[in-house]
Amino acid sequence: MIVYSFPTLYEEIVKARINRFTVVTESEKICHLHDPGRLKELIYPGNKILIRNVNGKRKTNCQVTAAWSGKEWVVTDSSIHNEIARRFLPSDAKSEVTVGKSRIDFAFDNTYVEVKGCTLARDGIALFPDAPTKRGKRHLDELIELRRNGYSVLLMILVFRTDVVCFSPNFDTDRDFSNTFIKALKEGVNVEVKVFQLDKENIVYKGEIPVCHQILEKSTNFSLP
């Protein structure tokens, strides 16, 4: 199932990532990178990327859309995450709902949904985050509190590569987030991990993968009921 389509994409080579949100290509294009993660395995000098032309108020007129993993193109544009997630939610779901000190991505009926995008994989395991995220931990804390108050809550993780068989929080990068993820599972927060593949200009939904229960049990002595 195609869930998103880009305009024409152009292949470039990374010359430098001059800050978190700006990439310079070997052809001297200056492109916006809409992903706050480290992306060290994807955005580095000499690697291939796909860009698209954009018009707007930014100083850049192109946007990094995907990067080559060595096996496939991995989408690196977090600006489209919620649009993709909405394809799996009721049409009347409300966006950007304020809860406590945070904004939760979606709400409908008695359900709250937070969306996270994942681009990192190691040994067949999808990992999030690839950089410490206090904001991500805060979102999990809000989901836990909502669950305790009787709401249905869902953490929807969008994985933009297919070389994965299960998902785990990235303990090596952010133990606080990872421990809170475990806590969320214990509290009854639902987790859906959806896998996508870039096929030419189209993002295609490939199905779901489970949370890596065996890895979590080994890392934290946590076992699911």
Swiss-Prot record:
Signal peptide: none annotated. One of its GO terms (molecular function) is DNA binding. Pfam families: SfsA (PF03749), SfsA_N (PF17746). Belongs to the SfsA family. PANTHER family: SUGAR FERMENTATION STIMULATION PROTEIN A. This is Sugar fermentation stimulation protein homolog. It comes from Sulfurisphaera tokodaii (strain DSM 16993 / JCM 10545 / NBRC 100140 / 7) (Sulfolobus tokodaii).
